[in-house]
């Protein structure tokens, strides 16, 4: 492995990076799927937990905290309810991982060619991370929207299958329906991924010397810290994205049937602030951070491990030849 922050930038062939990124996304998604469903349910809940009066007209469930929400879902929908939306999510995570790591590697290598105008290492990591995140988010956004809508379904199913959901959205909402909330997603993910990769590259070298870290390795620990700090800063846009993704003709058919009608990122933010206060923008933050830690640790550890295995396999194959 290369020293310092260069390890993600120039190690491995393009094929190895693509495969390692895809594997990392696949494994990470399956592990954190239950937390993702819980987070989405909490983000779409608009009534106040501290105000019983706001519960009077609620026809759906009232979720209170991560563990109780998980128990409610299992009791009402079965254990499989915690993996709702997992098929589009798995597809999204694999494609996202491939595009993200490939774009990050390509961008950093391109920036390295700017000898005269070379950016500082932290700035290079920020630019490459933001570029990779923006491209990956825009490219996989329809799958992200489908993941959210399936996770928001209760026992009354809005969509019966992945293909039927694609047909229904295309027929009833047009192709623009697949990109509801995309501006919030890109507005969130570009600074998020920039902050994530810059923090990750900065923390990994000093953490690499410690063997007994809580998450097992310097790669994993750096990934956890980078993800948690970046996600906290950008969380309001993530919540707005989820609220916008369930807009349209099926808005009142999901598990929470009282989701308001929102239009645009800024109008959504103003309406949430006016009706729910600043805390309304952070619903689901706790479970999101719980999810961020294992997701980032698993993603970065799986990526690094897969990349090393692929490199070792190539070396072994070349020796046989």
From Swiss-Prot:
Residue ranges of Solcar repeats: 12-110, 120-206, 214-309
Keyword Cell wall biogenesis/degradation tagged: no
GO BP terms: transmembrane transport
PANTHER family in the cross-refs: SOLUTE CARRIER FAMILY 25 (PTHR24089)
Function, in words: Mitochondrial transporter that mediates uptake of thiamine pyrophosphate (ThPP) into mitochondria.
Entry similarity comment: Belongs to the mitochondrial carrier (TC 2.A.29) family.
UniProt protein name: Mitochondrial thiamine pyrophosphate carrier 1
Origin species: Aspergillus niger (strain ATCC MYA-4892 / CBS 513.88 / FGSC A1513)
